[in-house]
Amino acid sequence: MLKREMNIADYDAELWQAMEQEKVRQEEHIELIASENYTSPRVMQAQGSQLTNKYAEGYPGKRYYGGCEYVDIVEQLAIDRAKELFGADYANVQPHSGSQANFAVYTALLEPGDTVLGMNLAHGGHLTHGSPVNFSGKLYNIVPYGIDASGHIDYADLEKQAKEHKPKMIIGGFSAYSGVVDWAKMREIADSIGAYLFVDMAHVAGLVAAGVYPNPVPHAHVVTTTTHKTLAGPRGGLILAKGGSEELYKKLNSAVFPGGQGGPLMHVIAGKAVALKEAMEPEFKTYQQQVAKNAKAMVEVFLERGYKVVSGGTDNHLFLVDLVDKNLTGKEADAALGRANITVNKNSVPNDPKSPFVTSGIRVGTPAITRRGFKEAEAKELAGWMCDVLDSINDEAVIERIKGKVLDICARYPVYA
């Protein structure tokens, strides 16, 4: 018989120890990976609920199993909130991840071998936008577009490529681009050749929800996002659309289930519903505004200290530090900062001479530090510490000194108070 008092700590000490160590790591390390964030205890409560027990293949009101009357309410809440938050008239909250949401869009709109225009991974794109190691690069004919010498999307080249290759779909969106995308311009280019415009806004969804970054939903045929990252919800995916046909929406639904997934994760969908409600609160807008301010503050320090920032700045939550001129690799920088309890990720920079496993840059994002309560002053102080480490990358005394400062500020700004 199952009892409420059953717990992991008393049953599986080895697993519990790893879980507790991760909790301590999160509290004692500064998180600057742009795709990571801290979700609320309400979201975690939803994910640890009895909803995890329920199979619910299908969609609200059209399930293949009985006993779905309450999970139907949960999923419909998530759908309605997603539509309201992003100004959409269609939402599918079932994708288990952003990549699976993207897979569903490809499946719904394309046939294998169709031509797709996607942002070059080396210029800030994502694996699912056409990388040869991903399903998107294996199943479709990918034509990459990129950024110009200033570090911004080269719309003239994008338009030229579109007219030359006549893709069936153009992908907007990124995993490491710090500028503002002109969604209207991308739709104009797509319309000029009769292509779909598909936008993956996974990185900026929270900023979009708060009105800090332009909303692609009115411009794109289909939009996907993750529900974590800047949106600060559970790990999962979401598909949105506005002004499309019922036929398109049916195709998208069918591409998710049964096309790519079986039963939805109802406990995660409940977490999405909570996070979407949280994103409608006034404090969420204030939070996202601070995310952008903190990113700009950090860039300012890196530039003052003589570091090159791709595109010269940032208009969202992330930026790339180009270490080529410093004769450092991203791998070295990542490791040294990690020893100081500062977590970043190595990242390729435009025209990177190093392999993706080594790279010549680091990607820095501010959603997680802002969630802890950091403002511009703390963000600038942190950027200065990072420069200290990078300036003395082989000096363990410097790294230990910065680690002490990190532990102190983490204690003052806990993740969960």
From Swiss-Prot:
E.C. number(s) listed in UniProt: 2.1.2.1
GO biological process: glycine biosynthetic process from serine; tetrahydrofolate interconversion
Modified residues (N6-(pyridoxal phosphate)lysine): 229
Superkingdom, taxonomy of origin: Bacteria
Reactions mediated catalytically: (6R)-5,10-methylene-5,6,7,8-tetrahydrofolate + glycine + H2O = (6S)-5,6,7,8-tetrahydrofolate + L-serine
Site (Plays an important role in substrate specificity): residue numbering on this chain: 228
GO MF assignments: glycine hydroxymethyltransferase activity; pyridoxal phosphate binding
Keyword rRNA processing: no
Pathway linked to the protein: One-carbon metabolism; tetrahydrofolate interconversion; Amino-acid biosynthesis; glycine biosynthesis; glycine from L-serine: step 1/1
Sites where the protein binds (6S)-5,6,7,8-tetrahydrofolate: 121, 125-127, 355-357
Chain positions found as N6-acetyllysine: 54, 250, 285, 354, 375
Enzyme class: transferase
Protein keywords: Acetylation, Amino-acid biosynthesis, Cytoplasm, One-carbon metabolism, Pyridoxal phosphate, Transferase
Assembly with partners or alone: Homodimer.
Family annotation (HAMAP family): SHMT
Name of the molecule in the record: Serine hydroxymethyltransferase
Taxonomic lineage: Bacteria, Pseudomonadati, Pseudomonadota, Gammaproteobacteria, Enterobacterales
